[in-house]
């Protein structure tokens, strides 16, 4: 099992290293700031951002004065997060790491947060245990997870119809199902609030160009196209263009699409 797991994790790392995720993360900067605002962090709060990407969550938390540590599987993301924090003159620490084997002590953080990040780790039960382990008793685990029925969940489903996901890996969007999240944390949390929230993807170009944008910059989409021959790529492109067009709320040549996610805030018992 371990060699298979190592191979899967290597593929996942290659996927998230492909493209330039920061170009995608820009699209929900405002949503990330709103997510942080709802956490009502205080100066000095010790926060860990798991799978931090380029710092969408970590940086607004650092602006508030939280004591922020971010970690990500992809070294390029860690570097970008550091650079983004330095650009604003913020103090935050960023590490390369694995959500399933966090390199931090037990009970180290007041808040353990993850926005569209830890949900992609291949073993959700292991991930849940690690999020809890590094959180102080009475501290909070905060997650933003795409739902199966929301737009991004539908985009994943569309892509999977052309390029099946790795065998044996539970769908990441199951983290967007409240009952599943409650089952994964179980009695190890004393409370759990789950709320449907919406993020708007806004781009100053057409849905057709949005698909090309994702193909260029979003690792999972780039890898999906790379796994297909010319005809397969054309079919995937058409389906994704149709999906973005059907959900587009703009008629002026630009794109605005709403995507639901599940916001989870749990208190460690």
What does each of the following model-derived ranges do?
Residues 28, 54, 174-269:
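Conserved Class I S-adenosyl-L-methionine
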Residues 46-102, 126:
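Class I SAM-dependent methyltransferase SAM/SAH-binding core
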Residues 2-45, 56, 80:
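Conserved class I S-adenosyl-L-methionine
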Residues 5, 24, 28-32, 74-77, ...:
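Conserved donor sugar-nucleotide recognition element shared by glycan-biosynthetic enzymes
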Residues 100-111:
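A short acidic, Gly/Pro-enriched loop at the edge of an enzyme's catalytic core
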Residues 125-126, 132, 136-205, 225:
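Conserved catalytic/acceptor-binding region of the Class I
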Residues 110-124:
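A short SAM/SAH-binding and catalytic strip from SAM-dependent methyltransferases
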């Amino acid at each position: 099992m371990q060699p298979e797991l190592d191979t899967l994790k290597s593929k996942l790392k290659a996927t998230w290293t492909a493209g330039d995720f920061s170009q995608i993360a820009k699209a929900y900067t405002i949503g990330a700031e709103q997510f942080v605002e709802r956490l009502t962090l205080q100066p000095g709060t010790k926060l860990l951002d798991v799978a931090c990407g380029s710092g969408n969550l970590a940086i607004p938390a650092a602006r508030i004065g939280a004591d922020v540590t971010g970690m990500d599987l992809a070294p390029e993301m860690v570097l970008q997060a550091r650079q983004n924090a330095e650009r604003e003159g913020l103090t935050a620490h960023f590490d390369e790491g694995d959500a399933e084997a966090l390199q931090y002590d037990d009970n180290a953080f007041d808040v353990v947060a993850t926005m569209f990040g830890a949900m992609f780790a291949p073993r959700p039960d292991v991930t849940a245990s690690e999020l809890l382990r590094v959180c102080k008793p009475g501290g909070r685990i905060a997650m933003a997870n795409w739902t199966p029925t929301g737009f991004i969940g539908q985009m994943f489903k569309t892509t999977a119809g052309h390029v099946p996901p790795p065998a044996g890996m539970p769908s990441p969007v199951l983290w967007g199902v409240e009952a599943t999240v409650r089952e994964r944390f179980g009695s190890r949390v004393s409370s759990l609030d789950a709320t449907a929230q919406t993020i708007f993807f806004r781009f100053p170009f057409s849905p057709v160009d949005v698909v090309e944008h994702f193909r260029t910059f979003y690792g999972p989409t780039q890898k999906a196209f790379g796994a297909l021959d010319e005809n397969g790529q054309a079919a995937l492109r058409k389906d994704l263009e149709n999906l973005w067009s059907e959900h587009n709320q703009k008629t002026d040549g630009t794109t605005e699409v709403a995507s639901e996610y599940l916001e989870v805030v749990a208190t460690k018992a």
